[in-house]
Each structure stands twice: as structure tokens, then as C-alpha cells.
């Protein structure tokens, strides 16, 4: 079996980096042993992180000579090398559906990213959400409700937590941080995600971090 010392996942701030959270959750869900390598948010790297510099590619998985740094690529790679984890749905149409909503998360919802950046240590009661971000929230809720209805929960694609849940987990934390009002079925799903052991572990670690970014206007 692959030892943890031979596989690394490079991530950045647990509190602020939603893509790091996604990659780490995917790696944990895969069951692949790995070592987490942190990129500190210091004065030298902060500007690059805020500008999404190509020289800072996080998360980045290194495994048996392969380097994979895009979150969707990491998801596909882990599904390939850890098939027993069933990160993607087994049925073809469900798998296509999963890839589509993950792609939508990967490339879309720019208003949400800008207006509600991830910040696990913060809480803003009665936060005022502008219309474009609200439109993104409504679309995400529609995606979740369709999946929970079609595949009967408790996770987006049925009985097993997978890629889609990991991709949308940082959005769940945003809804908590910014006090987004949700209907009971969606609130229940969010509570389920927050209670998932790997998600809870990441959040606990984020709350213990000391780094602060005063102005965060882009997701990394």
C-alpha cells in the first residue's frame, strides 16, 4: 500500500482557501494515505495568493511521480487510482450529472465568490447579499434540491458522499458564515455536510490558524 510519506497534497490557508479544502476533502474521501504540506500565507506569498498567481498552484497532489494541481483533475485522478472509494457515481447518467454540476461549481458562481469569500472563522449575522450573489445562491439551492430529490439523499448522489459534496462543501461554510437563510431541506443537507468528520476536522484546523487576510476579494 502507498505510504503517506510518498504522497503529498500541498494546500494553502484552511480558513480562506476553498480550493484547498476541496482538494483535501477529495483526498481524504479517496482513502489514499497522504501528507499535507501547507503553503504559509506570509508577506512574500500573500499578494500572489490574492491574485491567483499561476506560480501558486494549490491544491497540488504529488503521487508516484505524477503532479496534479487542478481540483477537478485531482478528483478524476483520485477516482481513477482509488476506484473502491466510489468518488463518482457508478451509473453513467448520474456520473454525467455529477461532472456537470462539479464543472458548474468549478467555473461559475463568480458573484458568490466575490461577495461571500470563504472565511471559516468569521460570522456575519443578517449579512446583506446583493442580487447577483443571491442569484448564484438560488441556482446552487436548485442544484442541491434536484440531486437530493433525484438520488434520494442523504448526499447529493445517494448513499455515499462523493466528489459533488466535496466540491460544494465550501459553499456550505459560506452559507453559515454569511447567515444565508435556507429552507429546511437544504438546511438539513448543510448540517449533514458540516457534521461530516473530514469537514469538521478541516474547520477545526482552520479555526486554530493564526493568519489573517485583511482584504480578500478573490477566491483561492
Language model features with spans:
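GST-like fold's C-terminal all-alpha helical module
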Residues: 105, 109-197
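GST-like domain detector, emphasizing the conserved glutathione-binding G-site
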Residues: 1-130
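Conserved beta-strand edge residues that scaffold enzyme active sites
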Residues: 41-42, 189, 207
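Acidic/histidine-enriched, glycine/proline-rich intrinsically disordered or flexible terminal extensions
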Residues: 206-220
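Phosphate-coordinating loops and pocket residues in cytosolic domains that bind phosphorylated ligands
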Residues: 51, 195, 204
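Residue-level detector of family-conserved "landmark" positions at structurally sensitive sites
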Residues: 37, 71, 185, 203-204
Amino acid at each position: 500500500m502507498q505510504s503517506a510519506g510518498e504522497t503529498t497534497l500541498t494546500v494553502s490557508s484552511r480558513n480562506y482557501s476553498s480550493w484547498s479544502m476541496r482538494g483535501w476533502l477529495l483526498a481524504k474521501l479517496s482513502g489514499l494515505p497522504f501528507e499535507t504540506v501547507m503553503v504559509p500565507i506570509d508577506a512574500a506569498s500573500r499578494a500572489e495568493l490574492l491574485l491567483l498567481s499561476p506560480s501558486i498552484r494549490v491544491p497540488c497532489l504529488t503521487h508516484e511521480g505524477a503532479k496534479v494541481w487542478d481540483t477537478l483533475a485531482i478528483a478524476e485522478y483520485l477516482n481513477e487510482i482509488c476506484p473502491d472509494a466510489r468518488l463518482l457515481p457508478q451509473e453513467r447518467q448520474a456520473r454525467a450529472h455529477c461532472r456537470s454540476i462539479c464543472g458548474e461549481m468549478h467555473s461559475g458562481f463568480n458573484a458568490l465568490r466575490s461577495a461571500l469569500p470563504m472565511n471559516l472563522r468569521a460570522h456575519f449575522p443578517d449579512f446583506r447579499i446583493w442580487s447577483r450573489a443571491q442569484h448564484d445562491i438560488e441556482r446552487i439551492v436548485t442544484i442541491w434540491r434536484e440531486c437530493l430529490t433525484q438520488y434520494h439523499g442523504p448526499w447529493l448522489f445517494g448513499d455515499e458522499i462523493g466528489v459533488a459534496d466535496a466540491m460544494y462543501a465550501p459553499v456550505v461554510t459560506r452559507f453559515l458564515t454569511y447567515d444565508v437563510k435556507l429552507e429546511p431541506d437544504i438546511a438539513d443537507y448543510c448540517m449533514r455536510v458540516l457534521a461530516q468528520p473530514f469537514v469538521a476536522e478541516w474547520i477545526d484546523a482552520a479555526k486554530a490558524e493564526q493568519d489573517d487576510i485583511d482584504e480578500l476579494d478573490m477566491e483561492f
